From Swiss-Prot:
One Pfam family recorded for the sequence: tRNA_bind
Cofactor binding, per record: Binds 1 zinc ion per subunit.
Gene: metG
Extent of motif 'HIGH' region: 15-25
Protein name as annotated: Methionine--tRNA ligase
Binding of ATP, residues: K335
One term of GO molecular function: methionine-tRNA ligase activity
Complex and partners: Homodimer.
E.C. numbers: 6.1.1.10
Amino acid sequence: MAQVAKKILVTCALPYANGSIHLGHMLEHIQADIWVRFQRMRGNQVHFICADDAHGTPIMLKAQQMGIEPEQMIAEMSQEHQQDFAGFAISYDNYHSTHSDENRELSSLIYGRLKANGYIKNRTISQLYDPEKGMFLPDRFVKGTCPKCKAPEQYGDNCEVCGATYSPTELIDPKSAVSGATPVMRESEHFFFDLPAFSDMLQAWTRSGALQEQVANKMQEWFDSGLQQWDITRDAPYFGFEVPDAPGKYFYVWLDAPIGYMGAFKNLCDKRGDLDFDEFWGKDAKTDLYHFIGKDIVYFHSLFWPAMLEGSNFRKPTNLFVHGYVTVNGAKMSKSRGTFIKAGTYLKYLDADCLRYYYAAKLSSRIDDIDLNLEDFVQRVNADIVNKVVNLASRNAGFINKRFAGQLADQLADPVLYKTFTDAATSIADAYNNRESGKAIREIMALADVANRYVDEQAPWVVAKQEGRDADLHAICSMGINLFRVLMTYLKPVLPSLTERTEAFLNTELTWDSIEQPLLGHSITAFKALFNRIDLDKVNEMVASSKEDMAPATRVTGPLADDPIQETISFDDFAKVDMRIALIQQAEFVEGSDKLLKLTLELGGETRQVFSGIRSAYPDPKALEGRMTVMVANLAPRKMRFGVSEGMVMAAGPGGSDIFLLSPDSGAQPGMQVK
């Protein structure tokens, strides 16, 4: 009995329309596209949509900086985004924008239903206001000193140094990031979505088993801490949709952004004419709805979004498919290192299938971060796609074309081996279906090893030179081509461009349901190179080009030029270092050393012995006695030839005679902690 085809709607998170697509974005779109292409190969009806997230203060301000209207900026950005996604063969059925008539109508409809059902609450709040720009300031547009660790230049919602969260009003000496003016407090009436009213429904959804375990666990933490009402409005000036019957009030971008999924699908329905919007979004819809998103936006998609849909009488998502972040060479993407690589820059240098394959080989259904190691990227693509898969075709096609007029043999040389390959279809399909593409790739490459071992053992290049063995040569090479066909069928969701060239070469479409029937007596076309090896030089050029995309850095002079600032550490790392004020009671030369001084330090109740390499700077050690300095007090004792050193004194300078012992300000006492 044939399986009934599913009807599936798939979305990716909407890219924000104030910047270019980069390789971090591409992880999600590639993951979703692989899953969508597989579902289509299996006969399911899939509608794959996305849109630009085109509203909010950042877009309004960036357009002002560019001297253009926001509408022009988001239109240009949409064109760039769509070009990048097309370059990576992301098979969207529709790519739209949240700044659309469909989205305006649906946002108003959902808001109206929520309000009518009693889920919208009004209350007056106090906010920071920029008196020069005449606008209320979002959290990220206020900067000041962290109220917890006192780090300067921190955003209005959290500190990037100590990790603390707070409200913008708690900042010390806050400034508007827009004008630099000191903001003032003003009151404004805002509208709130009553999220706590949906707590029971959301907890039941969480426990349903549909969500990834990591997502469900995170949601439970939020439930335990208590859900809060959600502010869904912003005051003018704001680029977005005005709230019906509330002049000067606009929907917060995160209210209309997920509704953009619905707007993009509504736009597709209107274009096509054969799709029913309610079949996919109606309260009792039997179709499937999946959102591919990053772990940074789980909060909005797992709490606000299903609650909004429930409260406005629409269906909830079938599931959220959440992925981790992308690092490059083991670190956060960096513009200075050239590893913040835009999608458009990548496409100038490399085949999109290469990145699609590398991501696929690393992806699983878990919310794990993916590292794009550029050297491993080159090696893996060349080893797997070129050496294992494409090489299988090139090793056999030449003989088929030259000796047998491009026609494959009428029988399989090894039906048992061929069945081993086709039997793997079930487990590989399960892996793809469960978003375990890394597992699928491992199984496919294991088969590729078997196929190449078969060719190595049969040695067609030797058989070709032996008289009377044409039939053997024909059978061996035809078997090799058929194994290549099975492998490429399995790889079709991952490698669309290579698949297209392969289908032209094999003169047949690669379909999942046809692999059990080998190509027998079938004509193939002349073999042409199907895939080029990645040249590491090209990768290095891409990285260099990504560096050049930045504005020229100001030339550093002085001490920083000779001794650059080290890699950033976390506040927790810094907090492990215990620095104390110390009184130098005694300072003396160390016999047998022309670099060290022996210091006896008093820490207010405890005495330490420290050996310090400052002799060249302080030829008269007695001059140091009675002086206050700073020492690292919790450094592990170090056994030296002259004795045990029980800490380290702090000094500045390049070394030699240019060393300057640090001293605290007057009033500091021995033993005081340096913070």
